[in-house]
């Protein structure tokens, strides 16, 4: 009887599927075309619960976004930012994140500073520090 229960338990456990961790990712690269201009790529998982999350950039930046297109497991949106000053010292917000989707953010500045952060449903705004982070 115990053997039968063990086999039955293993059969049930093998059939369980877990949630695939597929975070959204925002990559922002400073460009040399103009001071405080950035090329960004917003990659949002196609398999998501609810409406697609959107990025709110600082008010001092004008945003030019292309139509999103699917690529692999993500919906890709290319964005051009032209800002009046650096992104450092300002916040970026992601609205409509789902419970199962976190958002990674990577900013590559021209002076080789790199900022990386994580946003989620409870903490959907991130402040980009003025000073570089050292870990």
Regions found by a protein language model. Name each.
Residues 17-135:
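Histidine-/acidic- and/or cysteine-rich, low-complexity loops and terminal segments associated
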Residues 2-3, 32:
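Extracytoplasmic entry segments of secretory-pathway proteins
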Residues 3-13:
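Sec-dependent N-terminal signal peptides
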């Amino acid at each position: 009887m115990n053997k039968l229960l063990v086999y039955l338990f293993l059969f049930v456990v093998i059939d369980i599927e877990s949630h695939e961790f597929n975070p959204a990712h925002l990559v922002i690269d400073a460009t040399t075309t103009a001071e405080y201009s950035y090329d960004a790529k917003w990659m949002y998982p196609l398999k998501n619960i609810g409406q697609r999350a959107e990025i709110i950039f600082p008010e001092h930046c004008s945003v030019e976004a292309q139509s999103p297109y699917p690529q692999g497991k993500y919906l890709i949106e290319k964005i051009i930012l032209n800002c009046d000053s650096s992104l450092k010292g300002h916040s970026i917000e992601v609205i409509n994140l789902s419970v199962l989707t976190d958002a990674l953010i990577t900013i590559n500045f021209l002076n080789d500073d790199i900022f990386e952060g994580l946003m989620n449903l409870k903490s959907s705004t991130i402040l980009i520090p003025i000073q570089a982070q050292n870990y």
